C-alpha cells in the first residue's frame, strides 16, 4: 500500500485517565518494525477486560492509553522478517500470542506463549520498548499488544490470526477474545460427553459462549447458574435448559445441583471469577468422573479452599486460558465453525455503534445491557 513505511495519521479513542470517557483524537501511528504488522481496524467490540483496566481500580494504571483487543481488520503493511501474513490479509488481533518457537508453542498441550503471553502493564512494543502511537511527539501507550480502539494499530505478528477473507469481520471480530474463551473452555477443556449434564456459572458473554460450546458438544442438560434472573431467558438461545439462582435457595448451590442431577453434574464451567462460585463449581461435579473448569479471574488475594477428599473421590479441577486455543493455529478453525453454521455468532451481538459514539458501548456495559456491542470504525 502507498502508506507502507510512512507514519499514518488517524483517529483513535484515547483514555487520558482512569474512568474518564474516551476522547477521539488524531494520533500518529508509526510503521511496523521487525516482526510487527500494521493493521487497519474495521470493527472492534468492547470486552469487560477493557473496562476493568480503564477503571484501573485494582492494578497499575498506565495512561494515556488506547484500549481495545476484540477486533477484526486488514493488514496494511508488514515489518522486516514477517512472512506469515501480507498486506490485504484479513486478521483477528489477539491479546495473547503464539511465537511458534518457545516450549509452550511447541507443546501440543499449551497455548501460553513465553514471548507473547498477555501483559496488562506493558504499554510498549516488545521489540524496542517504545510505543507506535503518539500525539504531538508524546507517546500514547498500547494495551495488551493490540489497542484496537484506533483506525490503525501496530502489533507483533504473533498476535494476529489470519482468517478466511470470506468471513464477515463485523461478526467474527467477537471471536478474538471472550467468545472463544468460553467456547474453548467447554469444547477443549471440559469436553462434555454427548448426553451429559453441564453447569455454567455466570451468564455473561463468556458463560453464554461456554453454554454454546456445551450445546455444540452435545450436552443434554445445560444448567445456568446466575444471581441475575433477567439473564435466564436470553441464555436459552445458547443452549441452557434450566436455571438456578442461588438467592432462591437456603442451601449451598453445590447441594442444589446435586439434588437436581442425582449426585452432581458431569461437567461445570466457572465464568465469574468469584471465589465462592469457583469452589461451588468444583464441589458440584459428580464423584468418579466430574470435571470442573475455571475460566473467571479471581481477586488477587482470593484463596481456593476445599476438602482434599473432593479430589480423592475422583473429581477433577482444571484451569484454562483463552479456552486452550493457540491463537494463530486454532482461531482460523473457530472462524470456520461459524462459516459452516455450527457456531452461531450473531446472537452474541446485541448492539452496534459508530466509532464516534464508542462511549455508548461503555455505558451499555455499565448498565449490564446486551452481550456484545460492535464498534464500527467507518461510519
Curated annotation (Swiss-Prot):
Which cofactor(s) are needed, names only? Zn(2+)
Q: What is this protein called?
A: Alcohol dehydrogenase 1
Entry's localization field: Cytoplasm
**Membership in a protein family:** Belongs to the zinc-containing alcohol dehydrogenase family.
Residues annotated for an alcohol binding in this entry = 49, 69
- Give the binding site residues for NAD(+): 49, 202-207, 226, 231, 272, 295-297, 322, 372
Task: Write down the chemical reaction(s) this protein catalyses.
Answer: a primary alcohol + NAD(+) = an aldehyde + NADH + H(+); a secondary alcohol + NAD(+) = a ketone + NADH + H(+)
Name one matching Pfam family. ADH_zinc_N
Question: Assembly and interactions?
Answer: Homodimer.
Gene Ontology MF, one? S-(hydroxymethyl)glutathione dehydrogenase [NAD(P)+] activity
Q: How is the cofactor bound?
A: Binds 2 Zn(2+) ions per subunit.
Question: What GO CC annotations are associated with the protein?
Answer: cytosol
- Name the positions where Zn(2+) 1 binds: 47, 49, 69, 177
Q: Which GO terms describe its biological process?
A: formaldehyde catabolic process
Q: What is its EC number?
A: 1.1.1.1
Which PANTHER family does this entry report, sorted A to Z? ALCOHOL DEHYDROGENASE (PTHR43880), ALCOHOL DEHYDROGENASE 1 (PTHR43880:SF9)
Query: Where does the chain bind Zn(2+) 2?
Result: 99, 102, 105, 113
User: What is the gene name?
Assistant: ADH1
Keywords attached to this Swiss-Prot or TrEMBL record, sorted alphabetically, are: Cytoplasm, Metal-binding, NAD, Oxidoreductase, Zinc
User: InterPro entries in the record, alphabetically?
Assistant: ADH-like_C, ADH-like_N, ADH_Zn_CS, GroES-like_sf, NAD(P)-bd_dom_sf
Origin: domain of life: Eukaryota
Q: Which organism is it from?
A: Cenchrus americanus
Amino acid at each position: 500500500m502507498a502508506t507502507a513505511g510512512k507514519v499514518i495519521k488517524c483517529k483513535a479513542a484515547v483514555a487520558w485517565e482512569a474512568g474518564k470517557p474516551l476522547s477521539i483524537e488524531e494520533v500518529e501511528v508509526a510503521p511496523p518494525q521487525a516482526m510487527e504488522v500494521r493493521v487497519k481496524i474495521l470493527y472492534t467490540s468492547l470486552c469487560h477486560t477493557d473496562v476493568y483496566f480503564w477503571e484501573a481500580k485494582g492494578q497499575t494504571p498506565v495512561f494515556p492509553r488506547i484500549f481495545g483487543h476484540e477486533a477484526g481488520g486488514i493488514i496494511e503493511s508488514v515489518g522486516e522478517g514477517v512472512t506469515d501474513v501480507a498486506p490485504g490479509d484479513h486478521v483477528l488481533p489477539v491479546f495473547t500470542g503464539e511465537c511458534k518457537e518457545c516450549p509452550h508453542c511447541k507443546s501440543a498441550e499449551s497455548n501460553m506463549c513465553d514471548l507473547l503471553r498477555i501483559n496488562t502493564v506493558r504499554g510498549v512494543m516488545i521489540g524496542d520498548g517504545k510505543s507506535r502511537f503518539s500525539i504531538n511527539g508524546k507517546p500514547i501507550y498500547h494495551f495488551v499488544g493490540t489497542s484496537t480502539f484506533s483506525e490503525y494499530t501496530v502489533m507483533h505478528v504473533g498476535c494476529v490470526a489470519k482468517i478466511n477473507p470470506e468471513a464477515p469481520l463485523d461478526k467474527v471480530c467477537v471471536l478474538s477474545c471472550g467468545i472463544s474463551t468460553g467456547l474453548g473452555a467447554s469444547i477443549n477443556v471440559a469436553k462434555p460427553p454427548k448426553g451429559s449434564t453441564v453447569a455454567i456459572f455466570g451468564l455473561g458473554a463468556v458463560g453464554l459462549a461456554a453454554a454454546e460450546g456445551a450445546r455444540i458438544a452435545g450436552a443434554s442438560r445445560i444448567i445456568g447458574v446466575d444471581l441475575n434472573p433477567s439473564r435466564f431467558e436470553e441464555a436459552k438461545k445458547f443452549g441452557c435448559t434450566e436455571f438456578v439462582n442461588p438467592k432462591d435457595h437456603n442451601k449451598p448451590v453445590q447441594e442444589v445441583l446435586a439434588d437436581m442431577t442425582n449426585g452432581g453434574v458431569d461437567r461445570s464451567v466457572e465464568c465469574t471469577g468469584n471465589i465462592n462460585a469457583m469452589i461451588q463449581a468444583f464441589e458440584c461435579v459428580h464423584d468418579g468422573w466430574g470435571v470442573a473448569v475455571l475460566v473467571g479471574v479471581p481477586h488477587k488475594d482470593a484463596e481456593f479452599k476445599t476438602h482434599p477428599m473432593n479430589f480423592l473421590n475422583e473429581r477433577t479441577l482444571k484451569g484454562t486460558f483463552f479456552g486452550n486455543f493457540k491463537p494463530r493455529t486454532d482461531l482460523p478453525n473457530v472462524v470456520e465453525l461459524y462459516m459452516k453454521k455450527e457456531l452461531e455468532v450473531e446472537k452474541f451481538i446485541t448492539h452496534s455503534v459508530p466509532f464516534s459514539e464508542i462511549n455508548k458501548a461503555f455505558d451499555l456495559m455499565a448498565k449490564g445491557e446486551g452481550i456484545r456491542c460492535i464498534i464500527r470504525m467507518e461510519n
